[in-house]
């Protein structure tokens, strides 16, 4: 839900302004006067971080500024720096020319150094001023074979956390959190029941990191503060990690992302299925559908394409919820096998519409009326 509103803002900001985007990969990076670069070690770390920012960090390659252990651990994943997909929602060559980095502090923390950097834009006007700064990143520098390299915050922050393994899930949480064994067991039962109902392959073990808020979760993703990367939950299947900002051992929506078979499916179907079976934003599928139905009732011009392109309803999780309603309708029509066919929808808007129409036996020009009819069935009288 939150991610959709940020996406809308990003498109508006980068594509709707008259500012010309520079494509240079050399950025104006300020070192705050609090940082004493006369100290050789501090200067080396500052230069390391500056070099990394100028190395097109959003491009996946063997970046020499990052530690080898994490590069090897995540070599088959999409990125090794956990901040990448949230910080660079537009290419670094664009983003870093708007939100210019200022290194705020480089402080010794045990054997590592914590590096904090604010990404702030000059000269923003109107509504865009409310979205400044973009974020404050905090990650670490560690010694590796006599050289300083960058490292994610997650293993450093969580190294002294408690860990409880139940079934295939290892729950990791700070000592201040009171572990709820009943909810943990409920999580195992949920994962097993979904896998059985939809005949998914056996699910792999994963680590479930429990925090109390989106801000605390953000720290595990290298953010002291974030706008573009703010979230209260994330399932990272390739990494075997689930992150929660709800302070609970039970997070069915995110479990779904770790249970679904690997496939580059359309996000409306992936998020729709997760919302249908696991709710979203702390609301059940039924509650989300009722909210969307009320908004549909107030607007008789909204189309399927408006929601698909996130032009309408992002503040009501319309993209997620409409996907869930489609999943429910497909299930009513053809059961589990039809839902599994829907889950094989490729990541293409045209293929999405084609597959929905084929499974539900409707014509392409009927999809708007179909969606309106199905959504309004959830309206409270």
Descriptions of predicted regions:
Residues 1-26:
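Bacterial Sec-dependent N-terminal signal peptides
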Residues 21-55:
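Short, low-complexity N-terminal intrinsically disordered segments enriched in polar/charged residues
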Residues 30-33, 58-106, 217:
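Short solvent-exposed beta->alpha transition segments
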Residues 35-44, 177-189, 242-250, 264-268, ...:
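Soluble non-cytosolic domains of exported or imported proteins
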Residues 80-128, 241-244, 252-255:
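Surface-exposed, charged secondary-structure patches
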Residues 128-161:
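Short beta-strand edge/turn micro-motifs at domain boundaries
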Residues 161-266, 351-355:
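Juxtacatalytic substrate-recognition/specificity segment
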Residues 242, 264-381:
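Acidic/His/Gly-enriched intrinsically disordered linker/tail segments
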């Amino acid at each position: 839900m939150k991610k959709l509103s940020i996406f809308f803002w990003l498109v508006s900001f980068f594509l709707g302004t008259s500012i010309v985007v520079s494509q240079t990969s050399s950025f104006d990076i300020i070192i705050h006067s609090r940082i004493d670069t006369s100290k050789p070690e501090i200067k080396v770390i500052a230069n390391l971080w500056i070099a990394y920012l100028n190395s097109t960090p959003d491009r996946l390659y063997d970046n020499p500024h990052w530690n080898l252990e994490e590069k090897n651990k995540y070599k088959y994943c999409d990125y090794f720096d956990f901040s990448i997909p949230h910080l660079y929602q537009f290419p670094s060559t664009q983003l870093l020319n708007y939100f210019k980095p200022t290194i705020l502090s480089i402080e010794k923390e045990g054997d590592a150094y914590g590096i904090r950097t604010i990404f702030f834009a000059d000269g923003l006007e109107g509504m865009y001023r409310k979205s400044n700064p973009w974020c404050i990143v905090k990650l670490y520098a560690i010694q590796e074979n006599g050289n300083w390299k960058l490292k994610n915050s997650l293993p450093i922050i969580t190294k002294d956390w408690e860990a409880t393994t139940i079934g295939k899930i290892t729950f990791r949480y700070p000592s201040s959190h009171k572990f709820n064994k009943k909810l943990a067991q409920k999580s195992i039962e949920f994962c097993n029941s979904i896998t059985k109902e939809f005949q998914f392959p056996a699910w792999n073990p994963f680590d479930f990191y429990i925090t109390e808020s989106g801000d605390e979760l953000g720290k595990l993703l290298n953010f002291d503060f974030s706008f573009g990367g703010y979230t209260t939950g994330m399932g990272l299947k390739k990494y075997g990690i689930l992150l929660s900002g709800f302070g609970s051992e039970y997070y069915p929506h995110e479990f779904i992302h770790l249970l679904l078979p690997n496939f580059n499916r359309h996000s409306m179907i992936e998020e729709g299925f997760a919302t249908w079976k696991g709710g979203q934003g702390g609301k059940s599928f039924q509650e989300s559908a009722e909210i969307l139905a009320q908004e549909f009732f107030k607007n008789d011009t909204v189309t399927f394409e408006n929601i698909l392109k996130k032009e309408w309803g992002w503040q009501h999780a319309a993209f997620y919820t409409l996907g869930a309603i489609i999943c429910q309708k497909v299930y009513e029509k053809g059961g589990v096998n039809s839902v599994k066919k829907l889950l094989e929808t490729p990541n293409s808007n045209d293929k999405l519409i084609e597959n929905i129409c084929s499974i539900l036996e409707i014509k392409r020009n009927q999809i708007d009326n179909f969606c309106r009819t199905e959504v309004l069935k959830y309206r409270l009288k």
